[in-house]
UniProtKB/Swiss-Prot annotation:
Provenance organism: Vitis vinifera
One cellular component term from this protein's GO annotations in UniProt: chloroplast
Entry keyword annotation includes Plastid: yes
Protein name stated in the entry: DNA-directed RNA polymerase subunit beta
Catalytic activity reported: RNA(n) + a ribonucleoside 5'-triphosphate = RNA(n+1) + diphosphate
Amino acid sequence: MFRGGNEGMSTIPGFNQIQFEGFCRFIDQGLTEELYKFPKIEDTDQEIEFQLFVETYQLVEPLIKERDAVYESLTYSSELYVSAGLIWKTSRDMQEQTIFIGNIPLMNSLGTSIVNGLYRIVINQILQSPGIYYRSELDHNGISVYTGTIVSDWGGRLELEIDRKARIWARVSRKQKISILVLSSAMGSNLREILENVCYPEIFLSFLNDKEKKKIGSKESAILEFYQQFACVGGDPVFSESLCKELQKKFFQQRCELGRIGRRNINRRLNLDIPQNNTFLLPQDILAAADHLIGMKFGMGILDDMNHLKNKRIRSVADLLQDQFGLALIRLENVVRGTICGAIRHKLIPTPQNLVTSTPVTTTYESFFGLHPLSQVLDRTNPLTQIVHGRKSSYLGPGGLTGRTASFRIRDIHPSHYGRICPIDTSEGINVGLIGSLAIHARIGHWGSLESPFYEISERSKKVRMLYLSPSRDEYYMVAAGNSLALNQGIQEEQVVPARYRQEFLTIAWEQVHLRSIFPFQYFSIGASLIPFIEHNDANRALMSSNMQRQAVPLSRSEKCIVGTGLERQAALDSGVPVIAEHEGKIVYTDTDKIILSGNGDTLSIPLVMYQRSNKNTCMHQKAQVRRGKCIKKGQILADGAATVGGELALGKNVLVAYMPWEGYNSEDAVLISERLVYGDIYTSFHIRKYEIQTHVTSQGPERITNKIPHLEAHLLRNLDKNGIVILGSWVETGDILVGKLTPQMAKESSYAPEDRLLRAILGIQVSTSKETCLKLPIGGRGRVIDVRWIQKKGGSSYNPETIRVYISQKREIKVGDKVAGRHGNKGIISKILPRQDMPYLQDGRPVDMVFNPLGVPSRMNVGQIFECSLGLAGGLLDRHYRIAPFDEKYEQEASRKLVFSELYEASKQTANPWVFEPEYPGKSRIFDGRTGDPFEQPVIIGKPYILKLIHQVDDKIHGRSSGHYALVTQQPLRGRAKQGGQRVGEMEVWALEGFGVAHILQEMLTYKSDHIRARQEVLGTTIIGGTIPNPEDAPESFRLLVRELRSLALELNHFLVSEKNFQINRKEA
């Protein structure tokens, strides 16, 4: 965070700064640290030694540009070169060469990496910090049991527990535990050293009997006892070197390696003074931990809160990339060791370049970015989605929690999250509370802790100092809860203010305050900070809003919001979507695909993005905002991107809305809209779909791309050029051929149809032996072809197939079934599109654009939408834009309502429209029914809120099935639109059909249309010939499956005919 020109003022840090700092830390420190760990490698005879000279490593500038990497599905990476030496010990000769170790994917200006043509981002992980934690639990008798858990750097745990007799045990597995004396002795301490280093030696001596003395008589006997308990081995194992190695690998490496963060935490918690470079668990640590545990037993000491952020650490992009580089170097070490031995065996002279291969590093990073749970494909629905994705924090992933086992307490908001993790923005569903979002001012500290900035209040000095505090430090300060804006520090402060101290919220005098917040949005994430009047909303609805803003579709004509929060500009700029001038100069030339800027003696050509597809099929497009000959300054907006206007985020539209019921068409969150939104292209968006096909070399020969497909009709091939690829700019419909392809196949006489054999026999015509495998346009894909790419990779073998990609643009107007939402969690589905003349209209004759249900407000408690609605109306009439800071009630009571009413009153005066503000019902107005012209009985709230169109569109959801695939086991239709699946008729649906008495429809759904194999085959013949469908005589497949499953449980199910006369069972089986 940077200090401004005025003392005490600050700017919001870049939203991608955490990603940039993490990657720079990996390049500057992480690479060097891991290269220094690379050992010297010797051959078996110890004649040759290989080593790396870490002081001189270099990363080469990539050969390709970012755009080309995306275009050709390549990785945007840098080659890593290191000096290596090969030393012959007998002659003391050394051969030094610069070797190529591998490719390391680079980070671009968006904070993402391009791997195989895809934008990928690494999100931050929250893990339990290594160290020791004390807690107590009640046993079945209601007695407190105290335990101390040592968490290693790898996530392994070693538990110390104390029983009723004050004996201390170390739990080595779920069932097995050993005495603390045995563990200390196995780690190298004798009894005298143990008793000298503890505060309560009499307690240790109290449970030292003869049997225990024998176990700790020597280090070897202690190790044997430890191994016997740990590995659950019976008999009398013999001490050996291999036994020690196994114990070291399986226990000590996983549970006793603390790392530098763990060493620092244990030193602080146990008041030790062990050097920081000693990152392994020592006997002194175990004994000091036992002392503290005894103190806990007798009421001395404080238990740890495991969910406090001071007990968590952030595993950032730097740590994850460094771990992968270390793993790659271990693999490289094994390769070099094997290559040296092979060269000596075959009497070859090795060189450093011959010994090293780039495969381990390159493949490790490719598999990490492709398969690791914390490496995700960048969500590029809109600019907000891009920057929010990189600021996520996750408890999930390797070494973390899982969605099914995480408790409610871990998911809940903790006081230490204040200013660090947003209390609102989290995912919905099973991962709620486990995936959060960092607050806008939060940063990752040196020790992996989340830090938040505060202003220090000092009586001695008038200067305001800004501090970044970790969660462990700000507990000791009285923190005022943001009682004033950072810009208004000169105003007289109130005498009594709300404050936070040691996780409690208090009300104290201003003189006692140590720190105060620096910004009203300090506690929120970017998504929550874009919600105006957020303090008037229920937190659940604010959560939905911050998630739904990320689902907004960029519209063809974007529009700035009338009511905003002030963060829209920075959110747009940090997303990298608008083009910004890097230096001042003059515009020489501009058109749709580039801007040429002249300045500082250079001429710079800036390319613009033209109809680029995002991974959510939305359209990314840039439009120049400067004219030729205009002089510009550094930082000025040159071009707007998708969903930005004038360098500000613009996700939706300001539309005229009325809150009223209308013939039941807006019940249950349905929305009624005017046809003006369709014909005026208000909510029209462009979507780009990608279709691709590959050509392979088969065993019968290579596949061919051609426009001569004998199997198909001519009108399906009308859009193909001479090469067999669809012509750029052509309009294509469902079923049209995009790429013509023929696959050769084996020609057998028996495989020909009878007419083909006749043609061959009579006329000697050679029938085609190729099968058409063309790329056809699927259902719902109609549109305009805007781009065709034929990617030919080097080599041309079957392992490097040629790829042809066709991009088709669709123009989608808003329609019935689409989802729209406001910024307060008020979402709904379009239920009906009314003609303009039928919509309710205002007193000045304007018809409203949307009609929302007023019952959706009081029960959801998202009243912020009413404030935004009314203020938007005033802003639309006065041609003003408002930027509202949250929690303005701290300045005066009812501040938000006063602001809205004053602006409505001013709009009423300036426009001479008294209906805008009527004192009897302020904020409401009488409106008229468009069908009859009569006024409605009650006054209605009307306004101009900001409404978004979401990515959940009916064109992507609508689906029908006449016939399709069936599951192999149950013989029932598959599930899902992608598999052409059917609609599920469950238990409650059956009840509903039974309630209406539709027996035949119910029978069809459970037999013909589902899993009765014979009956569904007969239906086809009956519909062709005519007549009635025969009733099924035997059971459907799912019933037969149930019978088979019962048989597998040794339960036989038989059925018999029962006589109607005497109800006796006829033993003849039916």
